[in-house]
């Protein structure tokens, strides 16, 4: 307890004037070959079709499209889960939720987070001499030792969970709409369905709450400024750096102001998409100016769009999940349909990652952990197994060999949290459970357990509308391979050193800069 208190005290000292006074940029340790800088940008609830390079109907991602033309675009890239916390945990550990313990989202009142016996990417790289920063949405625990500053990040600036998990003074756009924070103590806003509590949304700098409620309309620019300043300082330090940016975009457009010109042609979601694209462009521009030759920039998303938000949700492109939509309910976020986990993905590293290349390799967010560790010349943490693989040969254009098999866990739809209920085998996909997620029209697909799984050939049916005939030789051959692959991975997980997250809830852990005020307000109205 004494050690933890001391670290909290040191990291949480107030910032006065300039940037990163507690980040040690000095060089120490042995001399070694240059290690690449790593910038990972993770969008929130962004659809595969929200990237213009993927989907011609999208015209709002000029910076990302330019990055695609200058780097590699992955068209068969998948989130490790179909909702926030599990996907982010897998990004930072290279392990599925059944191994790392994070199978569903953490709440504002969550006591726990990503289990502390799980080793994060930042912890590995910091041991290798990297200076590390995390900017944006964390959502892997905010209380005590689960905070980013205790999970390998020298610097943290952001909201510790989703940007809709607390009230603000200008709540932006949501469906259904949510009211603003009460303007004075003693008033209640009656949050209603699908809105969070009256506690104001906090913005942290390291362990300090610096705004509560946060001003969402200026948040994207604050994230860009912090990212740019970190890259600037780290690039002159002589040390390699890791920057992980968890965007507040896309989610729902809580930060955008109403479009003034041509509103019929400029949706709120598109305005938010352009704002996100500008933020990414600023980060890439800084990399180009100060660290272009030795920096890998990897952009992707945590899961697909949130269909129940209707016009405030993103585009799945051609991955409609038609079988599910005909049954009712959503085939996007929370589900194992393609719209729930197939996400945009780009890699950029001039001189190393070939330009204007489209990769069809079957890849996953799980692969970032082992790939980055290999590029840094580090070793994987011992005494545990990993679901991701080193795909640097794919990154460098030397191979199109990705995964043969991927497993898609339930992320809040029908079935148990974290259960591997869908299996991807080459271009085939087998569903053992379907239904359970809400669509825009309010319908929820019936929970259906398929003893003989639905199997789709994605080369012929990217829309997942027509499964294979169960009596066909093709179905029987795929079924045999899928059954064996699923049995093997479940046995492998059973034999692994797995963790279990603490999902206990306690109102006393809610972030609060002013416990004497009902909403924890520290900012004047």
UniProtKB/Swiss-Prot annotation:
Keyword field contains Signal: yes
Q: Where is this protein localized, as stated in its record?
A: Lysosome
Task: Give residues annotated as binding substrate.
Answer: 137, 162, 251
Q: Which EC class does it fall in?
A: hydrolase
Give the principal location in a single coarse category: other
Recite the UniProt keywords alphabetically.
Calcium, Disulfide bond, Glycoprotein, Hydrolase, Lysosome, Metal-binding, Signal
Q: What Enzyme Commission number(s) apply to this enzyme? A: 3.1.6.1, 3.1.6.15
Q: Where exactly are the transmembrane stretches of this chain?
A: none
PTM entry text: N-glycosylated with both high mannose and complex type sugars.
> Which residues are modified to 3-oxoalanine (Cys)?
84
Identify the catalytic residues. Answer: 84, 139
Does the keyword section mention DNA repair?
A: no
Question: Which family does the UniProt entry place this protein in?
Answer: Belongs to the sulfatase family.
User: What's the protein called, per UniProt?
Assistant: Arylsulfatase G
**Which species is listed as the source?**
Mus musculus (Mouse)
- What gene does the UniProt entry assign to this protein? Arsg
């Amino acid at each position: 307890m004494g050690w933890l208190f001391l670290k909290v005290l040191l990291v949480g000292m107030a910032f006065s004037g300039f940037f990163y006074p507690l980040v040690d940029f000095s060089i120490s340790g042995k001399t070694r070959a240059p290690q690449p800088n790593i910038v990972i940008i993770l969008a929130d609830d962004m659809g595969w079709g929200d990237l213009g390079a993927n989907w011609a109907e999208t015209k709002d991602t000029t910076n990302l499209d330019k990055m695609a033309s200058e780097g590699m675009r992955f068209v068969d890239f998948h989130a490790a889960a179909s909702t926030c916390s599990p996907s982010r945990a897998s990004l930072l550990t290279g392990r599925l939720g059944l191994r790392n313990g994070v199978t569903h989202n953490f709440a504002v009142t969550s006591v726990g987070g990503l289990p502390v016996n799980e080793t994060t990417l930042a912890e590995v790289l910091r041991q290798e001499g990297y200076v590390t920063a995390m900017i944006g949405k964390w959502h892997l625990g905010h209380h005590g030792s689960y905070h980013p500053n205790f999970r390998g990040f020298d610097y943290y600036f952001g909201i510790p969970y989703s940007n809709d998990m607390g009230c603000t003074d200008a709540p932006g756009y949501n469906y259904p709409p949510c009211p603003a924070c009460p303007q004075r103590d003693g008033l209640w806003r009656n949050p209603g369905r699908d809105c969070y509590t009256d506690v104001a949304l906090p913005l942290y700098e390291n362990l300090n709450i610096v705004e509560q409620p946060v001003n969402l309309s200026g948040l994207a620019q604050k994230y860009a400024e912090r990212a740019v300043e970190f890259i600037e300082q780290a690039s002159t330090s002589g040390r390699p750096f890791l920057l992980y940016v968890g965007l507040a975009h896309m989610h729902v457009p809580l930060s955008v102001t109403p479009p003034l010109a041509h509103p019929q042609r400029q949706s709120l979601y598109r305005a938010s998409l352009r704002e996100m694209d500008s933020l990414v462009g600023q980060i890439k521009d800084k990399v180009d100016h100060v660290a272009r030759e030795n920096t890998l920039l990897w952009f992707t998303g945590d899961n697909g769009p949130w269909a129940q938000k209707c016009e405030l949700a993103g585009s799945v492109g051609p991955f409609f999940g038609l079988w599910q939509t005909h049954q009712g309910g959503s085939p996007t976020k929370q589900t194992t349909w393609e719209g729930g986990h197939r996400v945009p993905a780009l890699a950029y590293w001039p001189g190393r990652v070939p330009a204007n290349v489209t990769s069809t390799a079957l890849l996953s967010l799980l692969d970032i952990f082992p790939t980055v560790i290999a590029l840094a010349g580090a070793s994987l943490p011992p005494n545990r197994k990993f679901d991701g693989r080193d795909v640097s040969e794919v990154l460098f254009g030397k191979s199109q060999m990705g995964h043969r098999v991927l497993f898609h866990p339930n992320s809040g739809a029908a079935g148990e949290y974290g259960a591997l209920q869908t299996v991807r085998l080459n271009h085939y996909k087998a569903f053992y459970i379907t239904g359970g997620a809400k669509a825009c029209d309010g319908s929820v697909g019936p929970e259906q357990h398929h003893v003989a799984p639905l199997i789709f050939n994605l080369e012929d049916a990217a829309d997942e509308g027509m499964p294979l005939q169960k009596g066909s030789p093709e179905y029987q051959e795929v079924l045999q391979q899928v059954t064996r692959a699923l049995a093997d991975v479940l046995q492998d997980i059973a034999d692994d050193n797995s963790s279990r997250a603490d999902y206990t809830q306690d109102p006393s852990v809610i972030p609060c800069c002013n416990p004497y005020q009902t909403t924890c307000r520290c900012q004047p109205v």
